């Protein structure tokens, strides 16, 4: 039977399935980490030593006292940092007085004389101390400590101050305590007099007084002068006359606060222990026309 054309199948009327293309699973992408390497800044321990690194990450290669990051540091010759301890610090021969706790940053003391553990220093504007130098009547050795130039005398004066002065006392109080101690614990003994206007006798007189506990006005004046200097005062002795131009006498003068004041421990001693009269006060006496609290002093230049 013939079928109509519309119902007849064509020879190639097979459905051909489209080719199945498999897409490969995408592999994860390899990402490179872009985290920044920390930049060294400030105080950095590079193994066994400490250095200072600037904000640019470079090591600071300067020497001496430097202001870095708003603080002060001392950089040695090899650029390592000096670690400070409280008090004196020898930084490659220069002594600095550190006012803070231990650490690498430096805290200076106020400029001026400074007593630490029985030693006297003079702090300069940059925090270092005077070394192998003098300021007026005060001489400082290589280690920055005040010295009379005689080790035996220095030790004797420090021992006297240790016995006379209370530890917590101010410098002004210690001066008075030393003065009173000399007046009350040493005795008068007639000894050699020295020419008016000379001062080179002070060391010998002070040493003799410390050794024997006895001496004349030159001994009183010399020993108190060295005590005052050990406390940081600009003190000196005068050989002149008292009461009249023929009465040899010696006393101590101290320059302070724009004035020059007179100290005469031996005259006080005489009124208390020799004359047995009412005590006089010759501690820090101001003068006018040679008169000091009722007593006439004749200076060599007059």
Segments the model singles out, each with a brief description of its role:
Residues 174-178, 213-228:
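Active-site nucleophilic cysteine motif
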Residues 219-282:
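Hydrophobic/aromatic-rich core segments of domains that either
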Residues 3-156, 194-195, 238-248, 252-253, ...:
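Extracellular adhesion/carbohydrate-binding repeat motifs centered on closely spaced tryptophans
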Residues 274-302:
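Low-complexity, Gly/Ser/Thr/Pro-rich intrinsically disordered linker/tail segments
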Residues 1-3, 162, 214:
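Mature extracytoplasmic/luminal segments of secretory-pathway proteins
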Residues 152-209:
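Secondary-structure boundary elements
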Residues 1-6, 185-186, 197-199, 228:
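Terminal non-domain segments
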């Amino acid at each position: 039977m013939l079928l109509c054309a519309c119902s007849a199948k064509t020879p190639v009327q097979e459905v051909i399935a489209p080719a199945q293309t498999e897409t490969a699973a995408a592999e994860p992408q390899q990402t490179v980490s872009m985290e920044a390497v920390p930049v060294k800044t400030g105080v950095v321990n590079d193994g066994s030593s400490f250095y200072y690194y600037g904000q640019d990450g470079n090591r600071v290669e300067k020497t001496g006292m430097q202001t870095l990051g708003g603080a002060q540091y001392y950089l040695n010759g090899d650029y390592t940092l000096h670690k400070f301890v409280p008090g004196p610090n020898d930084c490659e021969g220069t002594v600095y007085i550190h006012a803070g706790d231990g650490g690498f940053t430096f805290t200076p003391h106020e400029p001026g004389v400074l007593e630490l553990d029985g030693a006297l220093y003079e702090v300069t504007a940059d925090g270092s101390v005077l070394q192998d130098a003098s300021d007026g009547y005060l001489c400082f050795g290589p280690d920055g400590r005040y010295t009379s130039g005689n080790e035996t005398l220095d030790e004797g004066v420090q021992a006297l101050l240790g016995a006379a002065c209370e530890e917590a006392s101010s410098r002004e109080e210690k001066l008075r305590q030393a003065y009173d101690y000399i007046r009350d614990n040493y005795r008068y003994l007639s000894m050699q007099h020295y020419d008016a206007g000379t001062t080179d006798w002070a060391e010998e007189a002070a040493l003799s007084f410390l050794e024997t506990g006895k001496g004349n006005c030159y001994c009183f004046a010399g020993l108190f002068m060295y005590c005052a200097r050990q406390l940081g005062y600009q003190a000196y002795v005068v050989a002149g006359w008292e009461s009249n131009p023929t009465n040899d006498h010696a006393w101590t003068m101290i320059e302070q606060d724009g004035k020059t004041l007179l100290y005469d421990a031996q005259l006080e001693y005489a009124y208390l222990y020799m004359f047995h009269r009412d005590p006089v006060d010759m501690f820090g006496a101001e003068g006018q026309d040679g008169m000091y609290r009722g007593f006439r002093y004749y200076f060599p230049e007059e």
